[in-house]
Amino acid sequence: MAALSLKGVRKSYGGAQYVLHGIDVDIADGEFVVLVGPSGCGKSTLLRMIAGLETVTEGEIAIGGRVVNALEPKDRDIAMVFQNYALYPHMTVAQNMGYGLKIRGVERALIDARVQAAAQILELGPLLARRPRELSGGQRQRVAMGRAIVREPSVFLFDEPLSNLDAKLRVQMRLEIQRLHARLATTSVYVTHDQIEAMTLAQRVIVMNRGYAEQIGAPVDVYEKPATTFVASFIGSPAMNLLHGRLSEDGAAFDVADGPRLPVAGAAGAGRGIAPGREWILGVRPEHMTPQPGEAFATLAVDSCELLGADNLAHGRWGAHDVAVRLPHAMRPTRGETLPVALPARHLHFFDPATGKRAG
């Protein structure tokens, strides 16, 4: 195991426009960090640079205190798990798991011992004699993880390993990866576009956007205090409601652009840097708008209601803004119904419309 450090890491191709812009992060020994963002944000490029599959244009990558910019992937003491399992079809599970050690000249007895140990961790013991075609998608991904485990690397790198699995298997594999990290405590960097994977797996999340690290922090902090409108809209399902408008001179109301006046008394508290009488983007998550006794409320004309099982989502519009409200299972408003919604001051977020950055 080892700490991983990225200092001012930038990437461009042929001296053209940069695709990664000055990434700075220190990942502690044994920490599980998730890079999350939409397609094209630079997360996989950054992972490939850590692995040595892409060169570093500027900056420094260090593993265990050793700068690895000039080292080949095989010399970085890392193991990688890919989206595509990359298993040899003619080899058994045991042979696939041990092949990387075999080509490195590791003794057969040690290979067998490590394969057996990894198989026990991943519950692959009964499958060791099978070939990939005889395995399910989840089993194949566990074999790919086992191949990484037997290396006993300093750092695990996961490149969207669950993308090829169906929804049920993704949930199962998320739990298995959690248990694996709890058992091995190996430094891990995990790439995904799925914010649910990021929130459930990570000790810290790095939210990527257009080559920048928009926010780095614990999942709960990123969710509760998004640094930008991008983070607010990307993290959370459904996304945070973002409303353009103007805060009244007394700070007691927010006038949604082409929409209603909303009561927000107490939201622009002292020291939060939220100036009244100016334009803001107001953010509030759907679950914080559930009607509560005694809360200041507005009304929303319901366009549709999604029945999700444990809870429901009511949808409507304030001006040009789509608004979603999470409701308990028993509340199922119909189209055209007027729904009272809460706007608790403690759960309101204000963002600068010019920069998209959070205030306060």
From Swiss-Prot:
All residue ranges annotated as the ABC transporter domain in the record: 4-235
EC number: 7.6.2.10
Family annotation (Pfam families): ABC_tran (PF00005), OB_MalK (PF17912)
Membrane topology: Peripheral membrane protein
Positions of disulphide bridges: none
GO molecular function: ABC-type glycerol-3-phosphate transporter activity; ATP binding; ATP hydrolysis activity
GO biological process terms held by the UniProt record: carbohydrate transport; glycerophosphodiester transmembrane transport
Keywords: ATP-binding, Cell inner membrane, Cell membrane, Membrane, Nucleotide-binding, Sugar transport, Translocase, Transport
Main location: membrane
Reaction catalysed by this enzyme: sn-glycerol 3-phosphate(out) + ATP + H2O = sn-glycerol 3-phosphate(in) + ADP + phosphate + H(+)
A cellular component term, taken from the record's GO annotations: ATP-binding cassette (ABC) transporter complex, substrate-binding subunit-containing
Taxonomic superkingdom: Bacteria
Subcellular location: Cell inner membrane
Residues annotated for ATP binding in this entry: G37, P38, S39, G40, C41, G42, K43, S44
Subunit annotation: The complex is composed of two ATP-binding proteins (UgpC), two transmembrane proteins (UgpA and UgpE) and a solute-binding protein (UgpB).
Alphabetized PANTHER family for the sequence: MALTODEXTRIN IMPORT ATP-BINDING PROTEIN MSMX (PTHR43875), SN-GLYCEROL-3-PHOSPHATE IMPORT ATP-BINDING PROTEIN UGPC (PTHR43875:SF12)
Known function: Part of the ABC transporter complex UgpBAEC involved in sn-glycerol-3-phosphate (G3P) import. Responsible for energy coupling to the transport system.
Family: Belongs to the ABC transporter superfamily. sn-glycerol-3-phosphate importer (TC 3.A.1.1.3) family.
UniProt protein name: sn-glycerol-3-phosphate import ATP-binding protein UgpC
Upper lineage: Bacteria, Pseudomonadati, Pseudomonadota, Betaproteobacteria, Burkholderiales
Gene: ugpC
